[in-house]
């Protein structure tokens, strides 16, 4: 019995020393952020991480290739039919009967997806003016990059809100970086009107950002041919105007068919020569790239 007490006391003392030593050695290790994650301050402390953060926002753009259970978006129209898909989505798409349900992640998961992208845009717009320039960049080049990134963030945010509108109608417009531990609800208890959401915000964002974006040639030569360019802003502006002039939205938006036609004509006048249904080029890579872009 005496030996048991001695052994127990010994191991308790050893454990106490070990715990104390761990605390002395590692400090508040368990309370620290994972080493592979950067804080907001760290991201925007240098241009390299700021650039990576900004380009990552492009990942929130979606495409029609196999997006919904391996089905193509064209199969939801009269243009095509999906021959392979899982979960019964093929049939639903082909007969135009795809609807919101617990499994319809395209509809249910889009809310979080786009608000995450919107938050990244807000974070960039909040911080980028204070990011130091890269060592190899001149002051003039840095100012150009900042202007382009801000314009791209405004475009992406407008695009994300437009995609949300197509699924949910007007949703809360968040243009600040919300504090997860702060008041998240009091300023977003009412749904904005269609005019406030689309006309006063989305269309204004698209119109204002166009001047700061790259032109199409510069975008193609930048090494990132998918970068947002001026024609993209004007094209989306025209698309939104077309929706707003429709019978469904005209009474609330105040936009007429003539205004929508003028927006489309503006795109064709300024950018129409840059695009075509068929173009020729001696470089197969360029032909394929142009077919997509």
Predicted segments with their positions:
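Structural transition elements
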Residues: 184-197, 249-252, 256
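Bacterial Sec-dependent N-terminal signal peptides
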Residues: 1-34
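Short, surface-exposed recognition loops and adjoining beta-strand edges that mediate ligand/DNA contacts
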Residues: 68-87, 137-139, 171-177, 214-232, ...
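Amphipathic alpha-helical repeat scaffolds of TPR domains
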Residues: 235-240, 245
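Long, intrinsically disordered, low-complexity segments
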Residues: 22-23, 58, 83, 114-117, ...
